[in-house]
């Protein structure tokens, strides 16, 4: 029996109405696309592409092309629908696959992993993986959380939803780490608390409506538990402790 590659079901449910699966807003992605000075015809590889909003809107606004890979069948289908809706299906392609270890057969002008650096065990591994698919002189995009406020204890870190304080860095240390990997940061765009609100709070209505529509589903207990806990966790921890941003890198 073959098992379909997928993300945990709680995310498939809670983020099923999201176009963007991170704390960026449409405006932040528009800003990022503008400040990167993308050239028409540039080709972008996006590992962990979610519902494809970055590639689709940049294809519309900047005439880029590209490939997005995501392990969620639902999000991949949504990305294809979004490309069709924006009239860019001829420029961008979306594949349902595991991005871990993926190395493209061709080289890209931009190689991105926005909020999914777990695919290669963290930032350093993801930078190394993306570099395999990058043209000489090309640009990497890394989307990564960082500590806005460093937890005082390991218990506090776990309450934030990470396993240890060491899982994330404060922003200055994260920025320094890119240099230590041999890269210049050539641009960055940071999320704000409004972006976190849009990412997290949008899940609550989705979960509530799912519960109303699926009261007898065996997964309803887990969704109910998440809905009970999520709002207070967000305003107590996520909103206060986490920063997030996309960093553009070029090899020194």
Kindly label every feature range from the protein language model:
Residues 53-100:
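Class I SAM-dependent methyltransferase SAM/SAH-binding core
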Residues 189-252:
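Conserved Class I S-adenosyl-L-methionine
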Residues 48-52:
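Class I SAM-dependent methyltransferase "Motif I" SAM/SAH-binding loop
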Residues 101-111:
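A short acidic, Gly/Pro-enriched loop at the edge of an enzyme's catalytic core
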Residues 110-123:
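A short SAM/SAH-binding and catalytic strip from SAM-dependent methyltransferases
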Residues 145-165:
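Short, glycine-/aromatic-enriched active-site segment of Class I SAM-dependent methyltransferases
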Residues 22-40:
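Conserved alpha-helix/loop element of class I SAM-dependent methyltransferases that forms part
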Residues 124-139:
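A short glycine-rich, Lys/Arg-flanked "PGG" loop and its adjoining helix->strand segment in the class I
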